Amino acid sequence: MEEKAGEIHAPRGNKLNTKGWGQEAALRLLMNNLDPMVAKDPANLIVYGGKGKAARNWEAFDKIVEELKKLENDETLLIQSGKPVGVFKTTKDSPRVLIVNAQIVPHWATDDVFWDLEARGLTMFGQMTAGSWIYIGTQGVLQGTYETLSALARKEFKKDDLSGKWVLTSGLGEMGGAQPLAITMNNATGIIVEVDEEKIRRRLRDKYLDTWTDSLDEALRLKDEALKSGKPTSIGLLGNAATVYDELMKKNIVPDVVSDQTAAHDLNLGYIPEGYTVQSAAEFREKDKDGYVKKVYASIVKEAEAILWFMQHGSKAFDYGNNFRTRALEGGLKNAFDIPGYVPAYIRDLFAIGSGPFRWVALSGDPQDIYKIDDAIIKNFQDDPHLIRWIKLAKERVHFQGLPARICYASYGEREKIGLMINEMVRNGEVSAPVAIGRDHHDTGSVASPYRETEKMKDGSDAIADWPILNALLNAISGATWVSVHHGGGTGIGNAIHAGFVIVADGTKDAEERIKRVLNADPGIGVIRHADAGYESSIEIIKKGPKFRYPYL
């Protein structure tokens, strides 16, 4: 695909470029996904996660922008895998945009078929928040990583944080780049292996990473120094994960916690094989794709073997949902799934109570709007000290990329309260412009992904994909501003179906009513999904009489 010259930045301020704030939010967040401070490769429309794109091609992007500017307040724009294909008269409470990305009939949902169709310009990989226009940079995954490590500390070490511990992990891309800050926010020290020096420098620039080196011995010295001084430190190590993990194993050096957040789900672009630089890997891939993939598999297996050895010697390890174990299994490592998945190990209890990665974006572009919302949450949610601790840490330490945004894990009930609070702040002028409210697709009731979010469900319903479709339909009829249904995010083609939404808080009474409906329905179906699978905490919420009914209670 031909690259596009010039940078894209979302408009700021109160001036509309469209016919309503719903359309304006879609326009600004589409553009924000391609801001060079946000996107992985904006010239090629790639936002994050291997080849997760915001639009199919530049012609489609330009058409989407054109249609959003013309779209009436009672019309809906249809996006088919990153391409605008129709505008229909609907209602003012209908979504302004409906997005469906990367759907393939199951029998054909393989990497080979999908990427052939993609190369022919017939589909697009949207990851989770790339093609649904609600990616907010590395902060988007930061709290999930923070929450995972916090839950690990409580479960494995019986502590509130990881003070005195050190973490070995890899990957400093658009998702993995959250790891160093999440590690130090949990008061641990970390060595994060990354093969691409540019990604290391980007995390240093964004203040997610403290320091870096290209020497394993120096990284270990810095780690020991940090542990001795009691000062949590994140150390980027330029190198290949397979090589580094294997060397540590041979040195008999065992981390307290070990993981991986490379884009291993994408065998072509997401994992550089051992012995290659980013540039030499690209040249090899171009000349011999099959040979390249074999090398990738061999490196993933080598890294996974080291992780299993670390586990045998006391490390707490987890797969962070990037399909790393599956790739190791495909590469011939039969016991790859002895590495536990992070959701059943640490996050499932949060999903069961309707909690997940909730986020909001200041369409004004003014960071003060986010800080004012932070302060309001600290004031009004005193009964949730964990939430308040996160908001205070994020306010102090998170560097905004593109439009200012905030993410937090908020549960059923809390999301509606936060949404209504934000709408009221817009109404009374405390916040200078409308705010877009949404979430990751990685959430309580919006995803079927047997290798990640729905791994080891209590009733065996890991692969049941009705729930994300019900979630999307429910959010659409409840009044979300836009709704998306995607395939393959996080764990790759054939492995996940998931849905998302965005709703705009513009301060109006209409927005208030839509917020009430959507922010009750969206986490509510997550509670039902887990209650239906037999989770007691979900059943207890339903017994307390929420704003929905579950026929079996």
From Swiss-Prot:
It catalyses: 4-imidazolone-5-propanoate = trans-urocanate + H2O. Its EC number is 4.2.1.49. One of its GO terms (cellular component) is cytoplasm. One of its GO terms (molecular function) is urocanate hydratase activity. Its cofactor is NAD(+). NAD(+) binds at residues 49-50, 127, 194, 240-241, 261-265, 271-272, 320, 490. PROSITE patterns: UROCANASE. The keyword DNA repair does not apply. Pathway: Amino-acid degradation; L-histidine degradation into L-glutamate; N-formimidoyl-L-glutamate from L-histidine: step 2/3. Binds 1 NAD(+) per subunit. Keywords: Cytoplasm, Histidine metabolism, Lyase, NAD. It is found in: Cytoplasm. One of its GO terms (biological process) is L-histidine catabolic process to glutamate and formamide. It comes from the Archaea. Pfam families: Urocanase, Urocanase_C, Urocanase_N. The active site is at C408. Catalyzes the conversion of urocanate to 4-imidazolone-5-propionate. Belongs to the urocanase family. NCBIfam families: hutU, PRK05414.1. This is Probable urocanate hydratase. The gene is hutU.
